[in-house]
Amino acid sequence: MAMVEMQTTAALAESRRKMQARRRLKNRIALTLSMATMAFGLFWLIWILMSTITRGIDGMSLALFTEMTPPPNTEGGGLANALAGSGLLILWATVFGTPLGIMAGIYLAEYGRKSWLAEVIRFINDILLSAPSIVVGLFVYTIVVAQMEHFSGWAGVIALALLQVPIVIRTTENMLKLVPDSLREAAYALGTPKWKMIAAITLKASVSGIMTGILLAIARIAGETALLLFTALSNQFWSTDMMQPIANLPVTIFKFAMSPFAEWQQLAWAGVLIITLCVLLLNILARVVFAKNKHG
């Protein structure tokens, strides 16, 4: 009997060792594959960043920010009008898109909750989040540009705002949902009106998360080109008239990069570097703001 028990114990131990060996082998294979996949993705990301930096740094100068885009096959010049135009488009898109996104997010998190209207809004919002920017551009072209019979800065603002609003809605709703219901109940117990509770408690508690969403939304629209081709188009001259086509960095980069002129191509690479650095800084700032609130 003792011999049988010893043999059984030895067999179980051997089976356990084999099972553990198989698990370790599977773990090594999975770890190796995941590391290889990560390295593959990082390689292309680093390669793109290095190519952008090495090609764009040569075109960086003070003239880039002070001079207008040059005529074809002309030395010198800069991207001042394109930078100013992009700044105006992003500014106005944020001014219009952010309040709409925040108010819609407040409705979904505080008022609508599981109502049919809230579900419809969430469904439409999910569609807009995943919609290609060129589809948004064509939509705005149809309802704005075609009706006005000319391109304009305001058409570009509307298109960019339509891309920005869904991100702000989703972020605002999610951040408000993270606020404990006990805080809401405590405010109601003190006789606080709902609007005041939202303004003084839930919004205040989630302001850093909402700011993070706004910054990410700005980063999202900063480099959009396709929709601006159908709305704001571009302008070779300095113009702040939003009723007319307005210069912007993404379309200028597209036009210059596709040209046969070396001077324009150099300016295009410099513009790409500017957009890359701006988006990188916005993402870093968003993470810092969110981390500060999380650990604070």
Language-model features and meaning:
Residues 1-40, 286-296:
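Transmembrane alpha-helical segments of polytopic membrane transport and secretion proteins
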Residues 13-36, 50-95, 255-266:
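Periplasmic/extracellular loop-to-transmembrane helix junction in inner-membrane transport proteins
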Residues 72-73, 228-276:
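Interhelical loop and adjacent transmembrane-helix boundary motif
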Residues 93-125, 138, 146, 286-292:
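Transmembrane-helix boundary motif in ABC transporter permease subunits
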Residues 94, 172, 194-231:
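Transmembrane alpha-helices
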Residues 108, 112, 173, 177, ...:
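C-terminal transmembrane helix and the adjacent membrane-cytosol boundary/short C-terminal tail
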Residues 113-117, 122, 180, 184-212:
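Amphipathic cytosolic juxtamembrane alpha-helices at the membrane-cytosol interface
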Residues 126-164:
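Generic hydrophobic transmembrane alpha-helix motif, especially the helices
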